[in-house]
Amino acid sequence: MGAHATPAEWKGREDEFIDFNIREMFPLVAKEGLAEFADIFCEKDVFTIEQSRRYLQAAREQGFKLKIHADEIVQFGGAELAGELHCASADHLLQASDAGIRAMADAGVVATLLPLTAFSLRETFARGREMIDAGCMVAFATDLNPGSSFSASVPLLFALACIYMKLSPEEAVTAFTINSAAAIDRADRIGSIDVGKQGDLVLLQFPSYKFLPYHVGMNIVDTVIKQGEVVVKNGETKS
């Protein structure tokens, strides 16, 4: 994510910073194979709609797939831009407009929602229920970071999604698995149990996924299988 914020040395020269990324960083990153996606934080007092459009269009021309962080703080038009550019996904979206939600649904943009971030910042939760009802594919991520999301708890994420975003447990599981794989263009390889896909499984200590939202702050994982190999058994990492 080359354009999360303007570095101090570029402050007040945001357009020049965008140019620097397009002219210098994109070719270098592409040549070294360091990234598959290009991302930008389209938000008030960060990067404008036009700056974001220019950055993302240039990224696509240089072979990158597109992502965008949008409409977290204010309703800014980032969701609409995500739809316009057919981004793979748009993150945050706490303040996404009705028009933005429709634009994402029409363009097949995955709405990646971050309920633990909203919880940590005491912000309004994204409208997950309305997004699903509008035809959006909703995904979830923890957004674990020291500045705005202080938890990696999946049970807490599920509880927030079901209580405050009004998703069913089935919808929350779908969002956290196959839809999250779609957000990184990996749905053909991971995210569900299917013939030919990578063998990634989590077995819980309880008889149903429906227990996930009811055990906030608890580790309910019994077994983790990664690429067909058992890496956690009885809640303990295998050496």
Residue ranges of model-derived segments:
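Metal-coordinating catalytic core of metallo-dependent amide/deamination hydrolases
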Residues: 1-76
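Generic detector of well-ordered alpha-helical packing
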Residues: 40, 44, 70, 92-93, ...
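Mid-to-C-terminal alpha-helical segments outside catalytic/metal-binding sites
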Residues: 178-179, 186-187, 194-201, 218-239
